[in-house]
Amino acid sequence: MGYLETTKSVYKDAALTPDIGLCCTTTPIWQFPGLSIPTKMQEMNYGCGSTVHPRDLVNNPKILYVGVGGGMELLQFSYFSRQKEGVIGVDIVDEMLEACQANFEEAEQQNGWFQKEFVRLEKGDALQLPVADSSIDVAAQNCLFNIFKQDELKQALKEMYRVLKPNGRLVMSDPICEQPMNAALRDDERLRALCLSGSIPLNDYLKMLTDVGFGTLEIRAKRPYRILDSKHYPTDETIYIESVEVCAIKDPMPEDGPCIFTGKAAIYFGEEPFFDDEKGHILLQNQPLSICDKTAAALALLNRTDLFISPSTHHYDGGGCC
């Protein structure tokens, strides 16, 4: 059995019998006025972060969600897109689609604003999405793409890029790991399906996104996720895994390379009211300005004693410039 078939088997079982500990996160779940999440739906939250960010979800967007789980984030997305088939959920596991549909029936009873027709569930493969080109405003996946090996990951990202409209957004949450993993971990199909041994370094993850054409990336969160230790896993060293939330924007690739926002800021504290680098960045006196890493590097090369560049927080929340 290949790793993709093992993954289907793991999530078939998780659909039939909810596994609260599977790929879960301790991140608080978004609470919105008038939104009630059914208990079973919450138990089937097989993610490692959140892909639901209100600032992405304006003007009744068309939303695609790949890997439906229990439907919790689909329900949250539909809160912002209250239209027939405003949200499309795609999954390759029949049992997960059936469980998700049952959860929506319960959600309809608990939420007066929600109608099942707001969400269209489709059987489909992340590697060949049943979605038209340039038809989606916001695409999302939560703790799925880390399972893919490199060739499949590249194909899945290409598919997301294909279906997004110009300036559309791909919002993702996945485990990452800066330490190398041995072959016993990498080749363990079940550990990969459980979102543990497929984790790659953050910079590699970001490069996969820019290689398929995304011109702007935002690192919105980075948190502790899991430990792989020698008592429980086939490893001689303790391996630390984090989860990351990233938004990739389908805008044109700048001539000087992608704009990647990791939470850096510049602060000018000189004698003048402002500092202008004559490249589109004006820093007011003692006011932080969010900047991309490319701009941070360029400003640092000026070697000014009245200019401070903060380290990456990996919690970028919008604004600023590149």
Show where each model-derived region lies.
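Conserved alpha-helix/loop element of class I SAM-dependent methyltransferases that forms part
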Residues: 24-62, 76-80
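Class I SAM-dependent methyltransferase SAM/SAH-binding core
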Residues: 59-128
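A short acidic, Gly/Pro-enriched loop at the edge of an enzyme's catalytic core
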Residues: 127-139
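A short SAM/SAH-binding and catalytic strip from SAM-dependent methyltransferases
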Residues: 137-152
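A short glycine-rich, Lys/Arg-flanked "PGG" loop and its adjoining helix->strand segment in the class I
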Residues: 154-169
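Short, glycine-/aromatic-enriched active-site segment of Class I SAM-dependent methyltransferases
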Residues: 176-196
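Short alpha-helix
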Residues: 197-213, 219
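C-terminal lobe and adjacent flexible extensions of AdoMet/dcAdoMet transferase-like proteins
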Residues: 212, 218-224, 229-322
